[in-house]
Amino acid sequence: MHMAIGLVGRKCGMTRIFTDAGVSVPVTVIEVDPNRITQIKTLETDGYQAVQVTTGERRESRVTNAQKGHFAKAGVAAGRLVKEFRVTEAELEGREVGGTIGVDLFTVGQIVDVTGQSKGKGFQGGVKRWNFRTQDATHGNSVSHRVLGSTGQNQTPGRVFKGKKMAGHLGDERVTVQGLEIVSVDTERSVLVVKGAIPGATGGDVIVRPTIKA
């Protein structure tokens, strides 16, 4: 299990920066509003250790009474989401309910994992969804250029096995990209810049954590 405190941010989009040698490096900009600590869970009271945070804003009319009570107890403003990070005893030191966690949690050159919700593509065929090769363009092939082809064997087993790769819904699922390097940490603007691409559409929420494969 990933036992490390992280941050919840928002994907701003991609750009590029140039190194001193003039090499173009593709980067993604992540805006990180202060993560407000709403609850600290301990082994004694909850059976596990975690730091629960919220970020952003939410209209009061969109907040349930249970959520209002939870945020009020912590003394923080209601956020657009709530996220927990499982942590060790050492990482709980200095953390208190009502406090904040910012981009200074990370340093330039640190390797991180970024989790987000991938872009939804809707219902897609086997060629796009699973990288199947297409059938013959000619030689007697009619209206079957992108169809799957055979999906089973013969009378035995006489069925299609579960999990067979077929056309279906693509994207809109939780995806983690591992091993991304932090290129810049801007504490004034509360912005992280990481090397490479991260999952999701512009404006989507992402979770940034120290890499699990250190």
From Swiss-Prot:
Methylated by PrmB. The lineage of its organism: Bacteria, Pseudomonadati, Pseudomonadota, Gammaproteobacteria, Moraxellales. It holds the Pfam family Ribosomal_L3. Part of the 50S ribosomal subunit. Forms a cluster with proteins L14 and L19. One of its GO terms (molecular function) is rRNA binding. InterPro entries: Ribosomal_uL3, Ribosomal_uL3_bac/org-type, Ribosomal_uL3_CS, Transl_B-barrel_sf. Keywords: Methylation, Ribonucleoprotein, Ribosomal protein, RNA-binding, rRNA-binding. GO terms for cellular component: cytosolic large ribosomal subunit. This is Large ribosomal subunit protein uL3. The modification N5-methylglutamine is found at residue 155. GO terms for biological process: translation. One of the primary rRNA binding proteins, it binds directly near the 3'-end of the 23S rRNA, where it nucleates assembly of the 50S subunit. The gene is rplC.
